[in-house]
Amino acid sequence: MIQIQHLTITHTKDLRELVHDLNLTIATGEKVAIIGEEGNGKSSLLALLVNPKAHFDHLSYEGTINKPDSPQVYIPQQISDDLQSLTLNDYFFADTYDLDYATLYRLADELHFDSERFASSQLVSSLSGGEKLKIQLIRELARPHDIIFLDEPSNDMDLTTMTWLKDFIKHSDQTIIYISHDEDLLSQTADTIIHLELLKRRRQARTSVEHLDYDNYSQQRTDAFQQQIQQAKTEKKAYDKAMAKHRRIKQNVQTTLRNTHDSTQGRLVAKKMKAVLSQEKRYDRLAQDMTQMPDKEDSIELFFSHITPLPQGKYLLNLDKKQINIAPHLTIDHLKLSLKGQEKIGIVGDNGCGKSTLLHYLYQRLSQKTDLTIGYMPQRYDAILPVELSPIAFLSKTGDKSEREVISSHLANLNFSHDEMNHAISDLSGGQKGKLLLLHLVLENPQLLILDEPTRNFSPTSQPQVRQLFENYPGAILTVSHDVNYLRQVCQKIYRLDSQGLEEVEI
């Protein structure tokens, strides 16, 4: 059992609360999902629950976290740099203390990771995002554990592994606390919801806890929101009607008082005015106690404009090659792919089959065209983001005041606070970095977008806007994704990649 009492987490760099007065008891075996918009402090809360005694840059907290001194597993969003430099052999076998080999090999089989690779000299850093997640799950879950902490475990998973993850969480006897933006995963696995919100332009934290599954929580929240709106409107209508009557009475009394010359009558009218003013104070108090319109986090606002797409029939890409090496250890028997000026193509496939490698290969090939402008969004944002700069500095070309004001307005529409616009990009969450890259694409107005898992770090609130953004984009798109909703809404054709090549599929 884990007990959290009056936990408040503050971002010390801009003195802003991320978590406000969280109180929760987590029972053994409970499945707790932490949800919220990008940059709302989900990973900070999870890391603090993993190790309440740790020191965190730019974070302080008040309150208590009591949890049993029992073995636990923590799988972060990204594997650490020191582990990235290891070979697979060292990753799995450099420290074999308390490693259950039977579980290790069983998990490898369940996750379709070839156990012969355990002894490989291949570097962890060379693995795909999905493979890195798999080896973490295999190694960590093969050790004793009573509590499991997962930070966005579904981000890089193929559809087969996602099915495994849902089944694992649902049927596990251990306590599992996890962060996710995947509504399907949430609806099938969570029985308790911690919802982190930042309201009033991200200045006010609201932390909600409900012992409900995700679907019921979402429905209850929607119903309560609508009920509060209706109650606020009803009370406001009654208040406005009462105040209109009160103003008429007050005006009549004021007119009578001004026109009264008899002292006796004047005293009576003055007494009546006193009663009217007393009633006015009661109305003022009533206004303060009225049901307020509910606060809600703003959805993002972003759209492409001023783009002149290439002609529909113009070929941007027309490949038909056999035995093509797109990387030192990746050969495709027959790569056949064409892309026209306004076509939107999606690529799917198992973890480690080479989707991101292929996409980068195509990006490099297409970048050689001098008559084509390309916007590129890799899976790992830091590969192209200058993390030492602020978002405003990154997006600025001239640095003049008017340009910075326009950029600030765009960032505000993506729910960046003033402080977040001016902090280093390295301080941003994964989702905020994703938003920043989206804005960069919009401001560049490219004719072709090459996107690697573009929805992976976005919340359920932001994802519909992201899908709509790319659906309405008038140019061509070449994208890799495991997000079925995104693929169905945006792409006209979808291909599955394996060692044989690309095959058009329906999903």
Language-model features: locations:
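Conserved beta-strand-loop-alpha-helix hinge in the C-terminal portion
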Residues: L198-Q231, E235, L497-I507
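ABC-family P-loop ATPase nucleotide-binding domains
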Residues: S70-K132, Q379-H440, E444-N445
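A short, proline-enriched helix->beta-strand linker immediately N-terminal to the Walker B motif
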Residues: E140-D146, L441-Q447
